Design a protein with these regions (language model features):
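Positively charged, small/polar-rich N-terminal and surface patches that mediate targeting and assembly
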Residues: 1-116
């Protein structure tokens, strides 16, 4: 079985939608880290202070096929009606893995069987 790490960097206000969507599609354990983004756009200022906005970094270890399915669903959440993106989502291959809950492995196996 091949695994991928899915990373979604989203505004805090979209964090729960991303988590709920991923869980609905079969994700188990999810790790969320706080962060702040420095993008290409001019920063907002308020009384002389620069506001950069808080970001959530959502991490998931997933079976490779499931990671693509979840990536596509999250991507749809991040694009608004004006076609503007409010985050980024990507995956990368995971070579070695230890400590994953065995019940999660059986969920991944079931997903593989269902997709065949």
């Amino acid at each position: 079985m091949k695994f991928s790490v899915l990373v979604a960097i989203v505004p805090e206000e979209l964090e729960q939608k991303v988590v709920d969507n991923a869980r609905d599609l079969g994700a188990g354990g999810i790790t969320i880290l706080g962060g702040r983004g420095i993008g290409n756009n001019t920063k907002k200022t308020f009384f002389g202070m620069t506001y950069e906005g808080s970001q959530s970094v959502v991490l998931m270890v997933l079976e490779k096929g499931l990671s693509l399915e979840i990536l596509k669903a999250i991507q749809e959440l991040l694009i608004d009606k004006d076609k503007k993106s409010h985050g980024v989502v990507f995956t990368f291959a995971l070579e070695h893995l230890g400590g994953i809950d065995l019940s999660q492995l059986s969920k991944f196996e079931n997903h593989l069987k269902d997709s065949i």
